[in-house]
Design a protein with these regions (language model features):
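AAA+ P-loop ATPase motor domain of ring mechanoenzymes
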Residues: 1-131
Length: 131
């Protein structure tokens, strides 16, 4: 690394796993913290496709209960839209599709979640959770 003359941009979501000697060789380290509730609310609203009616979607609940990065929120919405389309729900995105996609994203991240975290939407996923 010391002999490299170009610009290198490195990204990780596991900084604590990086060796201190490696970190000392980096000239600049910029941290991007997870978005807060207000930022997540804006992200949830902004990633819903324009063709989708957001009327039944509880963005406030999603932003408050699930501390996720923007990329994870975008992946959740994408997956929920695919699932809805697969089930024939034309341009209709439901909270059930979203909370199932949230659970799927938490599973991918190997992040623990509880039915309590899903609040009033817990019955929508209770029968589909992994043991």
């Amino acid at each position: 690394m010391e002999r490299f003359k170009g610009l290198a941009i490195l990204a990780t979501n596991r900084r604590k796993d990086l060796d201190e000697a490696f970190l000392r060789r980096l000239r600049f380290v910029i941290e991007f913290p997870l978005p807060g509730t207000a930022e997540r609310l804006r992200i949830w609203r902004s990633v819903i496709p324009a063709e989708v009616d957001p009327g039944e979607l509880d963005f406030d609940f999603l932003a408050q209960r699930f501390p996720l990065a923007g990329g994870h929120i975008r992946a959740i919405v994408f997956h929920a839209c695919l699932q809805s389309a697969q089930m024939g729900a034309e341009r209709r995105l439901t909270m059930q599709a979203l909370v199932l996609a949230v659970q799927r994203e938490y599973d991918k991240l190997e992040r623990a979640s509880s039915l309590d975290q899903f609040g009033k939407y817990a019955p929508l996923i209770a029968t589909r959770r992994k043991p």
